[in-house]
């Protein structure tokens, strides 16, 4: 799922833009020009770097949201199957534990995400750096860029864990569902998920 930071879209670069407003059956269009402050000490190169990194982080947030969605969808499928079985298989139990473990590394799963929440997970750390870099028009600092790289590395590790689950326990679980004549989880394509989120 998306969080508050993902609702802050990257700022528009300087240039001409067409604005379209629809009110009932009426459509109003106007062209506007976005300009940078001519008195700003921030150079174009710094703005370009900020925009590039902000867009990378925005895409990163979408990738993470899609992974969390897949984990949640399969976890619900596992829970439904377990509730219909007198005794879940060892593989299903292992899969349930692995999905919960992966989710706990991706997002805060305790508290209300505002007060008394658990220690920040990948999503919360990513949101923080996105808000900081995206909220300042100048180039990110070297320490901020190091943080971004560390978060990317962490996400790659979680993606490897997910790929391993898909080819291992999840594949066996799907076969188990087929034997029980139960449908597997239906995962929306990423483009559909992002459009609906």
Feature map (PLM): residue ranges:
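Generic detector of short alpha-helix boundary/capping microenvironments
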Residues: 5, 13, 36-38, 169
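Low-complexity, Pro/Ser/Thr- and charge-rich linker/hinge segments at domain boundaries
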Residues: 29-63
